[in-house]
């Protein structure tokens, strides 16, 4: 009977703390964050102006997240926040499609193309 009492008094084993993995340091993250912000802006403006393929920008962002942040939730959060920031920045300024909204969309689309080219030419495989 003493052995049974001794087994019941024993504390459960202490599990070691799980330390989250440090986020990966990616040399092109700054440019990638800017690209995500630009994609969010272009997505909003193209949808606002009913431009062809307006919804494909969000799909492009999802593909970017899937390929770049597969097992990195912190990076995914940062890129998603950048996309949302770009979207909201123009949503707070433009509620109608105006000539300046069209010009802004074109400029941002060109910036996005430049960023994508820089990232892939410098860091692509």
PLM-predicted stretches and their roles:
Residues 53-125:
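Compact alpha-helical subdomains of small soluble proteins
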Residues 2-7:
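N-terminal signal peptide c-region/cleavage motif recognized by signal peptidases
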């Amino acid at each position: 009977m003493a052995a049974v009492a001794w087994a019941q008094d024993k504390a459960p084993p202490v599990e070691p703390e799980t330390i989250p993995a440090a986020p990966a340091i990616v040399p092109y993250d700054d440019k990638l964050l800017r690209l995500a912000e630009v994609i969010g802006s272009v997505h909003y403006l193209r949808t606002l102006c009913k431009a062809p393929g307006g919804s494909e920008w969000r799909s492009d962002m999802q593909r970017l997240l899937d390929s770049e942040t597969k097992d990195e939730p912190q990076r995914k959060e940062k890129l998603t926040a950048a996309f949302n920031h770009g979207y909201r920045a123009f949503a707070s300024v433009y509620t109608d499609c105006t000539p300046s909204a069209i010009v802004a969309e074109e400029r941002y689309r060109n910036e996005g193309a430049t960023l994508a080219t820089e990232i892939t030419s410098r860091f692509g495989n």
